[in-house]
Curated annotation (Swiss-Prot):
Transmembrane segments: 804-823
Protein name: Cell surface glycoprotein
Natural source organism: Haloferax volcanii (strain ATCC 29605 / DSM 3757 / JCM 8879 / NBRC 14742 / NCIMB 2012 / VKM B-1768 / DS2) (Halobacterium volcanii)
InterPro entries per the UniProt record, alphabetical: Csg_halobact, PGF_CTERM, Surf_glycop_sig_pep
Compositional bias per record (Low complexity), positions renumbered to this chain: 761-787
Source lineage: Archaea, Methanobacteriati, Methanobacteriota, Stenosarchaea group, Halobacteria
Post-translational modification: O-glycosylated on 4 to 6 threonine residues; glycans consist of Glc-Gal disaccharides. The N-terminus is not blocked.
Length: 827
């Protein structure tokens, strides 16, 4: 019986095993039949049932009714950012990698190839387009309604295994018109359809020929879940009511010399069109090469040149008609999508209205001569202008300035100056012209207008009010020899492209000052001074020092372009005592004095020549006063001299530093004053040393010679007054020594630190306090009255706090108690 039961159990177990294997096979077969990604075969727009090895995407909602989503809805990441992270297929997959890392997920996180797994990817559309039946890409372009009857919307994307991309078309108001414009019934785009121009290429066909003019929106997105982020794409298509080829300008009115962009519109992708203008619109003196450059070879331009009815002369060619025998200047542009872009160089065009014409596809440049254009537009060319921004206003003889301005129609300009007669050329540069940059500006820097060659510069070397102007260099070549003329009449100047301003020429000016400390420079051997000032019109100034013994020292200092100069640490290098200091600048004539010096030269003497004369003076036996007179006689006091000079005096002295006063910060006072413990001690003094370059150290020592404080300063004004502050909180009372040390000199004083500083200032509020510290007020009645008032509370306080025992009341109670006790005992 037992054996029979065992056999029965074995049979049942075998049956269960066979049944489970068979059921698994059936389940596998069923899943294979619904293989994810076979959307084309199943005519499905999406499939959310997945199996091991499938790809899933961010944002998807996976089916948990069958497949891996039913058997293993919770997976674990195996590597990278996803390692150890759970992927729950029972809920929609998050849309971002921040919430769900990309990577491989399997049922146990092992990463084994035999373990059921999926790969999580980010859905994206990688490319999209709208094509015409001829293959022209019109995405984002404008086409005529007649050309919009057979269009294809295509895309490449990575999530076709999950769902198709669906096409939605919206009109300018945002209304969905997809069903109205579909060429078929399918709104779903197959992956890999890019470039397709047929109904079998996987794209979606649309017919926009019956739609009104306006901008239409074509939206691509997943058919089910994938309608966000990179899984979507939006394109535009503009339908034009104009059926023929058109032409537009980015600006219909420009200044001569300004580049203009034109756009051929409503074209068919790949078609070529001729754009042309009549050569009579060019300037009379335009050359053949310039005529060939009117149309720029940019953008969608494939050819430029000039033509007559029988031949063309293209850019780079040396054969064909010339500007005298050609009829048109032209460009050939190729339509890209629905439009083509080109450009025009207007500097060779006359200032007039120019008709720009476009021809149908297939019309050549030679055929365009004498043939009516399909469309045209008028470009207005206005005469160019020039402006001179600098120099204007005031000009100082000898100074350097920048010459700059604008010229909208010129390759180069020339600068002229006028007094009362003709305009005279300013000879700037080798060819007397200034080139105009591509942004229509011109500039020459650091030009000394009064120091150039020619009559124009001579005018500006004398004070007065004149006119300075700029003119197109081609208009300044009245003689026609290829170079600007030396002079122009007023009529010649104003008839050209020109403008002018007033300019006032003034003499040079000199200011300057020497920086000393309290009128001194120290020490004698190494003392230096700083100088600064203005010397308009000068390139440099000469600084001269003369001491009382007649010794001379000097240094040349350059002047900046703004007319200022600034030089630090000029060594005086003379003997102790009074020093006379000069700052000298040559005047408008650029010569020292009358141009001659005793040591040479006989004319045209410069600052450099003057230094040789100063060396001679330094070797003779004249005293300082005589040397100063000799310098003046050869410079500013010389006949007809226009030199300029600034003179100051100071003392060259040995360095010195002293302590002048010590006081508490709350009570400023002259001299050495006591300071109470806890107050801030202010130590003030004077020096003749330069700040920053020197430091004054202050050390405070007690009666034992121990240093208790050390401070320093390198900041003081030109009056030489310095100050430091020291906290005395940790000081004991007594006499302290304060020493100031500048590195070469010291000064020492003693100061008292007291427990309480005496205050001699009294008021009605502190009269009582004052009487306790002085002899006089102690005998007054005022002192006695408060004393009596104080005694009364003192007696009360004494009674309550100093009575021995328990007090009188307690003693009486004790006596009564003792009596009663004695009476009780007696009874």
């Amino acid at each position: 019986m037992t054996k029979l039961k065992d056999q029965t159990r074995a049979i049942l177990l075998a049956t269960l095993m066979v049944t489970s294997v068979f059921a698994g096979a059936i389940a596998f077969t069923g899943s294979a039949a619904a293989e994810r990604g076979n959307l084309d075969a199943d005519s499905e727009s999406f499939n959310k049932t997945i199996q091991s090895g499938d790809r899933v995407f961010l944002g998807e909602e996976i089916s948990t009714d069958a497949g891996l989503g039913a058997s293993n809805p919770l997976l674990t990441g195996t590597a990278g950012n996803s390692e150890g992270v759970s992927l729950d297929l029972s809920s929609p997959i998050p849309q971002t990698t921040e919430n769900q890392p990309l990577g491989t997920y399997d049922v146990d996180g092992s990463g084994s190839a035999t373990t059921p797994n999926v790969t999580l990817l980010a859905p994206r559309i990688t490319d999209s387009e709208i094509l015409t039946s001829s293959g022209g890409d019109v995405t984002g372009s404008a086409i005529s309604s007649s050309d919009a009857g057979n269009l294809y919307v295509n895309a490449d994307y990575n999530y076709e295994s999950a769902e198709k991309v669906e096409v939605t078309v919206e009109d300018p108001s945002g209304t969905d018109i997809t069903n109205e414009v579909l060429s078929g019934t399918d709104t779903f785009v197959d992956d890999g359809s890019i470039g397709s121009t047929s109904s079998t290429g996987g794209g979606v066909g649309i017919d926009m020929s019956d739609q009104d003019a306006g901008e239409y929106t074509i939206i691509l997105e997943g058919a089910e879940d994938l309608d966000f982020g990179d899984a979507t794409e939006t394109m535009t298509l503009t339908i034009s009511s104009q059926d023929e080829i058109g032409i537009e300008l980015d600006s219909e009115s420009v200044t001569q010399g300004t580049d203009v962009q034109y756009t051929v519109t409503n074209g068919i992708d790949g078609n070529e069109h001729v754009v042309a203008m009549d050569l009579s619109d060019l300037q009379n003196d335009a050359t053949t090469e310039q005529a060939k450059e009117v149309f720029r070879n940019i953008g969608d331009t494939s050819e430029v040149g000039i033509a007559n009815s029988s031949a063309t002369n293209t850019s780079g060619s040396s054969t064909g008609p010339t500007v005298e025998t050609a009829d048109i200047a032209y460009a050939v542009v190729e339509i890209d999508g629905a439009s083509a872009v080109g450009g025009i160089e207007t500097q060779y065009l006359d200032d007039s209205e120019v008709d720009l014409e476009v021809y149908d596809a297939g019309v050549s440049a030679t055929a365009a001569v004498g043939q009516d254009a399909t469309n045209d537009i008028t470009l207005t060319i206005e005469e160019g202008g020039t402006t001179l921004s600098s120099p204007t206003g005031q000009y100082v003889v000898g100074s350097e300035v920048d010459i700059n301005g604008t010229a909208t129609s010129s390759d180069s300009v020339a600068i002229y100056v006028r007094d009362d007669g003709d305009w005279q050329l300013l000879e700037i540069g080798g060819d007397n012209e200034i080139s105009v940059d591509s942004d229509d500006t011109f500039e020459e820097e650091d030009i000394a207008l009064s120091g150039l060659s020619g009559d124009g510069s001579s005018i500006l070397s004398l004070t007065g009010t004149y006119r300075i102007g700029v003119i197109d260099a081609s208009d300044a070549d009245v003689g026609g020899d290829g170079s600007v003329d030396d002079s122009l009449t007023t009529s010649e100047f104003t008839s050209g492209v020109s403008s002018s301003n007033s300019i006032r020429v003034t003499d040079q000016a000199l200011t300057g000052q020497f920086t000393t400390i309290n009128g001194q420079v120290a020490p004698v051997e190494t003392g230096t001074v700083d100088i600064n000032g203005t010397a308009s019109g000068a390139n440099s100034v000469l600084v001269i020092f003369v001491d009382e013994r007649g010794n001379v020292n000097y240094q040349e200092v350059s002047v900046d372009s703004d007319g200022t100069y600034d030089e630090d640490d000029i060594t005086v290098g003379l003997t102790q005592g009074r020093v006379t200091a000069h700052i000298l600048s040559v005047g408008r004539d650029s010569a020292i004095g009358d141009g001659s010096l005793p040591s040479g030269p006989s004319n045209g003497a410069t600052l450099n020549d003057l230094t040789g004369y100063l060396d001679t003076l330094d070797q003779n036996n004249n005293n300082g006063e005589q040397i100063n007179e000799l310098i003046a006689s050869e410079t500013v006091d010389e006949t007809a001299s226009d030199d300029l000079i600034v003179t100051e005096t100071f003392r060259l002295a040995e360095s010195s530093t002293s302590i002048d006063s010590i006081y508490p910060d709350a009570a400023e006072a002259a001299g050495i004053n006591p300071v109470a413990t806890g107050e801030t001690m202010v130590i003030a003094g004077s020096t003749n040393l330069k700040p920053d370059d020197n430091t004054i150290s202050i050390e405070v020592t007690n009666e034992d010679g121990t240093s208790v404080a050390l401070e320093d300063t390198d900041e003081w004004n030109n009056d030489g007054q310095w100050m430091v502050e020291i906290d005395t909180t940790d000081f004991e009372t007594g006499t302290f020594t304060v020493e100031a040390d500048d590195g070469d000199n010291t000064d020492t004083v003693n100061v008292e630190v007291v427990s309480e500083r005496e205050d001699t200032t009294t008021s009605s509020d502190n009269a009582t306090d004052t009487t306790t510290t002085t002899d006089g007020p102690t005998e007054t009645t005022t002192t006695a009255e408060p004393t009596e008032t104080t005694e009364e509370p003192t007696e009360e306080t004494t009674t309550s706090s100093n009575t021995p025992g328990f007090g009188i009341a307690v003693a009486l109670v004790a006596l009564v108690g003792a009596a009663l006790l004695a009476l009780r005992r007696e009874n």
